[in-house]
Design a protein with these regions (language model features):
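Short, well-ordered helical secondary-structure segments
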Residues: 3-6, 25, 122
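Sec-dependent bacterial lipoprotein signal peptides
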Residues: 1-19
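Extracytoplasmic electrostatic interaction patches
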Residues: 75-203
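Alpha-helical context
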Residues: 14, 58, 121-122
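N-terminal export/targeting and maturation segments
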Residues: 18-94, 98
């Protein structure tokens, strides 16, 4: 009986330690410091304002045109839409004649190729804003891009976000997977900023 009560007491203590207890073993910075970096530097980094605005305008037109199409009702407000007519009327093409992609996933799906790692050319431009130390904690993902004549990616914009790991305490799991008193969770801070690199470099 005493053993059972001891176990229950330990479970209660583990639960009451807090659902948001921090785990900073992998970080030199605290979670609150990483959150501050996310709010300050997280967001969209635009390398080519002209092409970025072209894509923004084109995608707005495409979105409105797709809304007007009546596709097969999939239920739940979803429809299967054939976008061929939209692609013909509003092709995803820049003024330089190159096809653009709105995410790296779109490119990899269409080309069946994996994009190379982001080059130092783009990393250095981001670091001029974030600084070397803050960049170490950043998660950088390509957004708008096109492929040049040398089959190299030219990035128009990228997403920069910050994340940290927390340990949540409680009683988790099931009979199949087993039970545990804690689990790791990832929290993201995207910031919502927009940095136009060309404009900043002119200052």
């Amino acid at each position: 009986m005493k053993f059972t009560l001891s176990i229950l007491a330990l479970l209660a203590i583990a639960f009451l330690v807090g659902c948001s207890a921090k785990d900073t073993r992998d970080n030199k910075l605290s979670n609150s410091e990483i959150t501050k970096l996310g709010k300050k530097y997280g967001g969209v980094y635009v390398f080519n304002k002209k092409y970025y605005e072209e894509i923004q305008q084109s995608e707005r037109k495409r979105k409105e045109a797709i809304k007007e199409l009546k596709g097969r009702d999939l239920g739940g407000g979803l429809y299967a839409v054939d976008t061929k007519s939209v692609d013909q009327k509003f092709p995803q093409t820049l003024s330089n004649g190159k096809k653009y992609y709105t995410t790296y996933i779109d490119y990899e799906r269409a080309s069946k190729k994996i994009l190379p790692n982001i080059s130092s050319f783009y990393e250095d431009k981001i670091k001029r804003i974030t600084g070397e130390e803050a960049y170490k904690y950043a998660s950088v993902l390509p957004l708008y891009l096109y492929i040049d004549d040398n089959d190299e990616p030219v990035y128009i914009s990228m997403s920069v976000s910050y994340s940290y790991k927390t340990k949540k305490y409680g009683f988790f799991g099931d009979e199949g997977r087993g039970f545990s008193l804690s689990r790791d969770e990832i929290r993201y801070t995207k910031g919502g900023n927009k940095f136009y690199i060309e404009d900043l470099e002119k200052q």
